[in-house]
Amino acid sequence: MSDLISALLLGILEGLTEFLPISSTGHLLIAEQWLGRRSDFFNIVIQAGAILAICLALRQKLWTLATGLGERANRDYVLKIGVAFLVTAVVGLIVRKAGWQLPETIQPVAWALLIGGVWMLVAEHFAGKLPERDVVTWKVAIAVGLAQVVAGVFPGTSRSASAIFLAMLLGLSKRSAAADFVFMVGIPTMFAASGYALLEMYKEGGFGSENWTDVSVAFIAATLTGFVVVKWLLGYIKKHRFTVFAVYRILLGAALLLWLPAA
């Protein structure tokens, strides 16, 4: 397979999995077993494509918040986004300084996919018994920030899955409201993570030699795919549960665990 096709597929995969509750990092680590390992810079660029995608998909909400800060409800919402982001940033930096690194084997990812799928089924079952609420509390904001760190430490967990379902269990029980808040928190989180990674790369000697055609194709693929996925998902969850994603995670995790001994 050519490097260009590989880059295209990885970009599409990033766009497909970044916002679905199935773990983009986990899927990229799995895909690299067949498509080849890419540079950290390449991975940062395709995540930037996903960032652009969600900004475009949520542009109306972003504009409403930016121009409506005079309203107390909008200020409160933005402050809670900020708190969730700060929790992620501070705890994430502590974890990073402690020497955490992504796993180089598939087994931890497989277990995270499997356990995360079960967690989704259980969490949605109990959240479904709560009265439907769309108010973001400070408790929810802090929990979402912590959930993002957990997802970063355990690839395969999924940032959106862990954060959305924890938010639902803690009172933000309306699925669409929980997803909206988690996606909004994801924007500064992904911006900061990408910026921090680029700064670290620069300090260590630059970005190395890259095939800019491959990088550009992957970026565009991630942006376009991510935009379509976000718009579709936000419509889907208004009428449907996350069950199909939970079942997919369980099946994929189990299949990988069965495949690993044979491989």
Curated annotation (Swiss-Prot):
The keyword Metal-binding does not apply. Keywords: Antibiotic resistance, Cell inner membrane, Cell membrane, Cell shape, Cell wall biogenesis/degradation, Hydrolase, Membrane, Peptidoglycan synthesis, Transmembrane, Transmembrane helix. InterPro entries: UppP. GO terms for biological process: cell wall organization; peptidoglycan biosynthetic process; peptidoglycan metabolic process; regulation of cell shape; response to antibiotic. It is an enzyme of class 3 (hydrolase). Its main location: membrane. Its EC number is 3.6.1.27. The chain crosses the membrane at residues 38-58, 75-95, 108-128, 135-155, 181-201, 217-237, 242-262. One of its GO terms (cellular component) is plasma membrane. It catalyses: di-trans,octa-cis-undecaprenyl diphosphate + H2O = di-trans,octa-cis-undecaprenyl phosphate + phosphate + H(+). It is a multi-pass membrane protein. It holds the Pfam family BacA. GO terms for molecular function: undecaprenyl-diphosphatase activity. It is found in: Cell inner membrane. Catalyzes the dephosphorylation of undecaprenyl diphosphate (UPP). Confers resistance to bacitracin. Belongs to the UppP family. Bacitracin is thought to be involved in the inhibition of peptidoglycan synthesis by sequestering undecaprenyl diphosphate, thereby reducing the pool of lipid carrier available. This is Undecaprenyl-diphosphatase. It comes from Xanthomonas campestris pv. campestris (strain ATCC 33913 / DSM 3586 / NCPPB 528 / LMG 568 / P 25). The gene is uppP.
